[in-house]
């Protein structure tokens, strides 16, 4: 077992010797004396407890151990440079255009105010914010970062969990005074259900779980819309039972204008940042994702505080 780890500067000395062909040439490249180069190689060999270089009148040659050390040294020094570049990059300010997409309801209520705050912190950024009522293709729709309320993310995208979320069943007290509250998922078929067709939702099918099982429930009613805001208004007016995100209905639950229906059931609808390229390649993308994660967690709860549905 090694008493200590090789130092990066000693690995650099070894690489320079191999590239230049001699101790003196390596010393000149490094701006050091030949004695310094000799000393660092001795320290490296002592650290690794092996001979790395054979010196002769014709020059220097790597031993078998030296060849392995040289190959690893190249990899280590490359990674070291990436580390330095990444840390140095953090000190600079992100700038340029970034295109962000989202659904209408969540985009208006949460992401738009978040972008306003983002621009206060990073005024060099330019943000184009576009709302969609459909699932989008990042390439075809020219979007750098899409905010999705949907756990089914294609494998060819990268996804970062912003916060956990669930959709819950709700109705106004006025509706439940007219019609008996359902006691099972099957009884939903006897009720006026307010059907929403948003980006990720199949029209008329509610996927509901209780932590032990998950069921697909076919529902119908006299009213349906592709706008969650309209469906929420209908529910408040006592028109039926709806399935909406908890962040959307929580104020009305607290005020008593809405009540939970079948509270043991919910639909997982976690909130994700979806993008194509790794975050380390783009500072503006990384800054936006990290900012939106902090924003959502501050207002909607941290990822480990959410509801997990089967």
Curated annotation (Swiss-Prot):
Q: Does the keyword section mention DNA-binding?
A: yes
Named from the GO MF annotations, one term is: sequence-specific DNA binding
Judging by the UniProt lineage, the source's domain of life is Bacteria
PROSITE patterns, alphabetically? Answer: HTH_LYSR
Q: Which residues bind DNA?
A: 23-42
InterPro entries registered for this protein in UniProt: LysR_subst-bd, Tscrpt_reg_HTH_LysR, WH-like_DNA-bd_sf, WH_DNA-bd_sf
Q: Which cysteine residues pair off into disulfide bonds?
A: none
Q: Which residues form the HTH lysR-type domain?
A: 6-63
Write down what this protein is called.
HTH-type transcriptional activator TtdR
User: Zinc: present as a keyword of the record?
Assistant: no
Q: So what family is this one in?
A: Belongs to the LysR transcriptional regulatory family.
Q: Which UniProt keywords apply?
A: Activator, DNA-binding, Transcription, Transcription regulation
**Matches recorded under Pfam families:** HTH_1 (PF00126), LysR_substrate (PF03466)
User: Any idea what job this protein has?
Assistant: Positive regulator required for L-tartrate-dependent anaerobic growth on glycerol. Induces expression of the ttdA-ttdB-ygjE operon.
Its GO biological process annotations read: DNA-templated transcription
């Amino acid at each position: 077992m090694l008493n200590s780890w090789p130092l990066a500067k000693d690995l650099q000395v070894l690489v320079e010797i191999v590239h230049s062909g001699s101790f003196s040439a390596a010393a000149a490249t490094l701006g050091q004396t030949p004695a310094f180069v000799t000393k660092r190689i001795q320290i490296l060999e002592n650290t690794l407890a092996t001979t790395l270089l054979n010196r002769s009148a014709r020059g220097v040659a790597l031993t078998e151990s030296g060849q392995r050390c040289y190959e690893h040294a190249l990899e280590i020094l490359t990674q070291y440079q990436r580390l330095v570049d990444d840390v140095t990059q953090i000190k600079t300010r992100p700038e340029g255009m970034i295109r962000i997409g989202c659904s209408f309801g969540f985009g208006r209520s949460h992401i738009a105010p978040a972008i306003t705050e983002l621009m206060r912190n990073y005024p060099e950024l330019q943000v184009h914010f576009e709302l969609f009522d459909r699932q989008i293709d990042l390439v075809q729709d020219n979007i750098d970062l899409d905010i999705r309320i949907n756990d089914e993310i294609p494998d060819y995208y990268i996804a970062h969990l912003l916060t956990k979320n669930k959709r819950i069943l709700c109705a106004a007290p006025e509706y439940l005074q007219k019609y008996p509250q359902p006691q099972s998922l099957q009884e939903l078929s006897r009720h006026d259900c307010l059907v929403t067709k948003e980006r990720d939702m199949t029209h008329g099918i509610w996927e509901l779980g209780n932590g032990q099982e998950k069921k697909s429930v076919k529902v119908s009613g006299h009213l349906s819309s592709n706008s969650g805001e309209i469906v929420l208004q209908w529910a408040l007016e006592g028109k039926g039972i709806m399935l909406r995100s908890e962040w959307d209905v929580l104020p009305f639950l607290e005020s008593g204008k809405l009540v939970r229906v079948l509270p043991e059931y919910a639909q997982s609808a976690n909130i994700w940042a979806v993008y194509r390229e790794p975050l380390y390649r783009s500072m503006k993308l990384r800054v936006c994702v990290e900012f939106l994660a902090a924003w959502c967690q501050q207002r909607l709860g941290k990822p480990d505080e959410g509801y997990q549905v089967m």
